[in-house]
Amino acid sequence: MKNVTDSFLSLGHWSSAGSFGLNTDILATNLINLSVVLGVLIFFGKGVLSDLLDNRKRRILKTIQNSEELGVGAVEKLEKARARLRKVKTEAEQFLVNGYFDIEQEKLNLIKSTYNTLEQLENDKNENLRFEQQRVIYQVRQRFFQKALQRAIGTLNGCLNNELHLRTISANIGMLGTIKEITD
């Protein structure tokens, strides 16, 4: 490694007349060398730098265009969402109004149904009362006729002889059969 370093140092000490060498003294370099280096950099670097700047410009413009498209799309989506929100609000209000109407309608139907049920129960009660009254009247009549018949038989038994007694019993049995047929 030391040989390589020595060879570079020896190049710096060569005389400038008739030979080519590197001048390691930065302050001693002349304006021409700097101009040549800058010219080479500008000539070869100009295309690369121009391409880099053009690519960067295209990317920036494309990003701006994409951002604008996304912004327009976002505005459209926002408008659609607002329209959907208005529609949902309208439907909700309609459901609310319909809900109140349905509740009132159900309430009226329930009241009407309850009234009809109570009326039917009242009719059934009255019919049952009439039936029970008829049954009680029938039973009272039956008992009355039985008592009257027993009294009549008792009176007849005390007053009549056997032959008259048998004829009376036969007649009463016939009357009872007729009464039974009428009531059935």
Curated annotation (Swiss-Prot):
<protein>
    <recommendedName>
        <fullName>ATP synthase subunit b, plastid</fullName>
    </recommendedName>
</protein>
<dbReference type="GO" id="GO:0042170">
    <property type="term" value="C:plastid membrane"/>
</dbReference>
<keyword id="KW-0812">Transmembrane</keyword>
<comment type="similarity">
    <text>Belongs to the ATPase B chain family.</text>
</comment>
<feature type="transmembrane region" description="Helical">
    <location>
        <begin position="27"/>
        <end position="49"/>
    </location>
</feature>
<dbReference type="GO" id="GO:0045259">
    <property type="term" value="C:proton-transporting ATP synthase complex"/>
</dbReference>
<keyword id="KW-0375">Hydrogen ion transport</keyword>
<keyword id="KW-0813">Transport</keyword>
<keyword id="KW-0406">Ion transport</keyword>
<keyword id="KW-0547">Nucleotide-binding</keyword>
<dbReference type="GO" id="GO:0015078">
    <property type="term" value="F:proton transmembrane transporter activity"/>
</dbReference>
<keyword id="KW-1133">Transmembrane helix</keyword>
<comment type="function">
    <text>Component of the F(0) channel, it forms part of the peripheral stalk, linking F(1) to F(0).</text>
</comment>
<dbReference type="GO" id="GO:0015986">
    <property type="term" value="P:proton motive force-driven ATP synthesis"/>
</dbReference>
<keyword id="KW-0934">Plastid</keyword>
<dbReference type="InterPro" id="IPR002146">
    <property type="entry name" value="ATP_synth_b/b'su_bac/chlpt"/>
</dbReference>
<keyword id="KW-0067">ATP-binding</keyword>
<comment type="subunit">
    <text>F-type ATPases have 2 components, F(1) - the catalytic core - and F(0) - the membrane proton channel. F(1) has five subunits: alpha(3), beta(3), gamma(1), delta(1), epsilon(1). F(0) has four main subunits: a(1), b(1), b'(1) and c(10-14). The alpha and beta chains form an alternating ring which encloses part of the gamma chain. F(1) is attached to F(0) by a central stalk formed by the gamma and epsilon chains, while a peripheral stalk is formed by the delta, b and b' chains.</text>
</comment>
<comment type="function">
    <text>F(1)F(0) ATP synthase produces ATP from ADP in the presence of a proton or sodium gradient. F-type ATPases consist of two structural domains, F(1) containing the extramembraneous catalytic core and F(0) containing the membrane proton channel, linked together by a central stalk and a peripheral stalk. During catalysis, ATP synthesis in the catalytic domain of F(1) is coupled via a rotary mechanism of the central stalk subunits to proton translocation.</text>
</comment>
<keyword id="KW-0138">CF(0)</keyword>
<dbReference type="Pfam" id="PF00430">
    <property type="entry name" value="ATP-synt_B"/>
</dbReference>
<dbReference type="GO" id="GO:0005524">
    <property type="term" value="F:ATP binding"/>
</dbReference>
<keyword id="KW-0066">ATP synthesis</keyword>
<keyword id="KW-0472">Membrane</keyword>
